[in-house]
Amino acid sequence: MTRLSSAFSKPHAALVTFITAGDGDTAANLDALVAGGADVIELGMPFTDPMADGPAIQEANIRSLGAGTTTADIFAIAAAFRARHPDTPLVLMGYANPMTIRGGEWFASECNKAGVDGVICVDIPPEEDAELGPVLRAAGIDLIRLATPTTDKARLPAVLDGASGFLYYVSVAGITGLQQAAQTSIDEAVARLKSYTDLPVAVGFGVRTPEQAANIAQVADGVVVGSALVELVARHGSNAAGALQNYVASLKHAIVAARKA
């Protein structure tokens, strides 16, 4: 069993948390997410044109790049995290340019050496992932795909072809962090996706409160929280770890209680 499959095999939905590499004290913040109860960590790779992200994550990208964060730094952060947390899955999330600028094989090799479990590439459609998909799979790294409210039954087979780890359902059309979908539409979407795949389905975009997380946890296999965490880093700077741990713990408590109810 892989680290990711183990995270999604618990009696409650997995709590998937996101922060941007190089924004604030990343090592301390990652440790805080784990201490708070995160089941999966998504580590954002900063990019100059994060078109799928809302203001909070865009600003985190600017802060990180302004601090001089490089791809080599991100892999060093990942490797150090793996040494400290051998059992917590780590997923790199970002855009094609930083992942492919030195070639897909190099990127997959670095992921493997750093102990990365999965990759989410926001801006490569399934038909165009020939540079990344095969080399990631060959390295044993999950390629996690995105589905949206506009992903219909004609499109879904292409999205699922070669996907592994989990399916990330983007619950609203648009950029991260600005709104949340109605719970009814999430329920319907998760049921529809699960009729097409055995992959765990995690729901994200716009999740902010323990109540929202609990509602999603009753139907989905995972709950993804990102912008709210990034905003805490922006607010607290290099001293964000305590706030992150407390907030994640409140989300985890709600998720566990929801699945047991």
Indicate where each model-derived feature is located.
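Glycine-rich phosphate-binding active-site loops on the catalytic face of alpha/beta enzymes
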Residues: 39-50, 118-120, 124-128, 167-177, ...
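Short beta-strand/loop segments at the ligand-binding rim of alpha/beta enzyme cores
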Residues: 10-16, 85-95, 136-147, 194-205, ...
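Catalytic cores of alpha/beta
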Residues: 24-35, 151-161, 203, 207-223
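Active-site-adjacent beta->alpha loops and helix N-cap segments on the catalytic face
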Residues: 1-7, 48-59, 66-81, 99-106, ...
